[in-house]
Amino acid sequence: MFRIGQGFDVHEFAEGRPLIIGGITIPHEKGLIGHSDADVLLHTIADACLGAIAAGDIGKHFPDTDPAFKDADSAVLLQKVWGFVREQGYELGNLDCTIIAQKPKMAPHIESMRKRISELLETSIDNINVKATTTEKLGFTGREEGIASQAVVLLQKK
């Protein structure tokens, strides 16, 4: 049996925070605002995984009203989600992600992101695709107000 999940997330830029995307710290003058470390890509992947097994979203499992998740490492949150997915008897078929950002350029960091995500999801890097695009200076990402991401995951029963 196969299950497909889709995820989407957006975070706003802010001064004085590190920029963490896909579990990788990226040099940039701004970071993203969030209750956790605001890793927009790992949040998107977690939502896609939870959606594939009809288990809600990360807000349900890790609410931003809970102080326990303040400044949480999104890699740890994704590992918890992935553990739950595996408990339900699923393994990863493949994951396809898109980061939507005007700046910074993501291309130099894509392979590091793929490697980190493959480690978190306990799978071959060949099952992980990460790509990036701009919005040609349109919308909030084009105005460099924040970053968005999308992901689609295919899970298969073990």
Curated annotation (Swiss-Prot):
Cofactor: a divalent metal cation
Keyword Ribosomal protein assigned: no
InterPro entries: MECDP_synthase, MECDP_synthase_CS, MECDP_synthase_sf
PROSITE patterns tied to this protein: ISPF
CDD domains, alphabetized: MECDP_synthase (cd00554)
UniProt cross-references to Pfam families, sorted A to Z: YgbB
EC number: 4.6.1.12
One GO molecular-function entry: metal ion binding
Positions that bind a divalent metal cation: D9, H11, H43
Site (Transition state stabilizer): H35, T134
Keyword Plastid: no
Keywords: Isoprene biosynthesis, Lyase, Metal-binding
Any one Gene Ontology BP term: terpenoid biosynthetic process
Biological pathway: Isoprenoid biosynthesis; isopentenyl diphosphate biosynthesis via DXP pathway; isopentenyl diphosphate from 1-deoxy-D-xylulose 5-phosphate: step 4/6
Cofactor binding annotation: Binds 1 divalent metal cation per subunit.
UniProt: 4-CDP-2-C-methyl-D-erythritol 2-phosphate binding residues: 9-11, 35-36, 57-59, 62-66, 101-107, 133-136, 140, 143
Catalytic reaction list: 4-CDP-2-C-methyl-D-erythritol 2-phosphate = 2-C-methyl-D-erythritol 2,4-cyclic diphosphate + CMP
Protein purpose: Involved in the biosynthesis of isopentenyl diphosphate (IPP) and dimethylallyl diphosphate (DMAPP), two major building blocks of isoprenoid compounds. Catalyzes the conversion of 4-diphosphocytidyl-2-C-methyl-D-erythritol 2-phosphate (CDP-ME2P) to 2-C-methyl-D-erythritol 2,4-cyclodiphosphate (ME-CPP) with a corresponding release of cytidine 5-monophosphate (CMP).
Subunit structure, as described in the record: Homotrimer.
Annotated family: Belongs to the IspF family.
PANTHER family referenced in this protein's UniProt entry, alphabetically: 2-C-METHYL-D-ERYTHRITOL 2,4-CYCLODIPHOSPHATE SYNTHASE, CHLOROPLASTIC
Protein name: 2-C-methyl-D-erythritol 2,4-cyclodiphosphate synthase
Organism: Bacillus cereus (strain B4264)
Record lineage: Bacteria, Bacillati, Bacillota, Bacilli, Bacillales
Gene: ispF
